[in-house]
């Protein structure tokens, strides 16, 4: 069921996606999500962590997209032009999000301590090409992260952020220029 809703989202979102078979065969972001769902099941339900990690690395080899099987991903994540996308172990992604090429949802720390060290994206978040969201930060609902932006702090709902470091350029549909 999740696979069908993802394919439907791709068809609605990407003007180049003209029919379902094209999406199934030619979209590495869709392949990566199919693999993630299996690997996540192995990791979280069956506790076959080595096997899940091994399969996730095989998926990375074929798709260019690295999704840790320990990540929590909601419905209809569309990874478009996904080469170089990295999604870390404690990342949480809500429903209806879009990631473009080169996006990193990365962690801070070494992983020695079992704490949340990767970002949380709530629902309907678009992270543009090359953007980096680093650490245990929360990106609120209905957000746009501009290309090449570096986000190190929480981002409130209904806004657009750009820059290094990120700052707000649109909030609730109104142009602004505010620090995070």
What are these language model-derived features?
Residues 1-59, 63, 174-180:
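Terminal amphipathic alpha-helical/low-complexity segments used for targeting or macromolecular assembly
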Residues 29, 46, 68, 88, ...:
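Residues at secondary-structure transition points
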């Amino acid at each position: 069921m999740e696979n069908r809703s993802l394919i439907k989202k791709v068809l609605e979102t990407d003007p180049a996606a003209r029919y379902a078979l094209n999406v199934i065969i030619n979209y590495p972001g869709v392949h990566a999500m199919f693999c993630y769902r299996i690997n996540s099941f192995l990791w979280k339900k069956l506790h076959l962590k080595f096997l899940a990690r091994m399969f996730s690395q095989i998926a990375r080899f074929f798709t260019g997209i690295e999704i840790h099987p320990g990540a929590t991903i909601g419905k209809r994540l569309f990874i478009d032009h996904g080469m170089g996308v990295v999604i870390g172990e404690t990342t949480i992604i809500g429903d209806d999000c879009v990631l473009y090429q080169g996006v990193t949802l990365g962690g801070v720390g070494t992983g020695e301590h079992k704490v949340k060290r990767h970002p949380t994206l709530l629902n309907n978040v678009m992270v543009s090409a090359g953007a980096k969201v680093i650490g245990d930060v929360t990106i609120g609902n209905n957000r746009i992260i501009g290309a090449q932006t570096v986000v190190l702090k929480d981002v409130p709902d209904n806004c657009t952020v750009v820059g290094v470091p990120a700052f707000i350029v649109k909030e609730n549909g109104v142009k602004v220029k505010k620090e995070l």
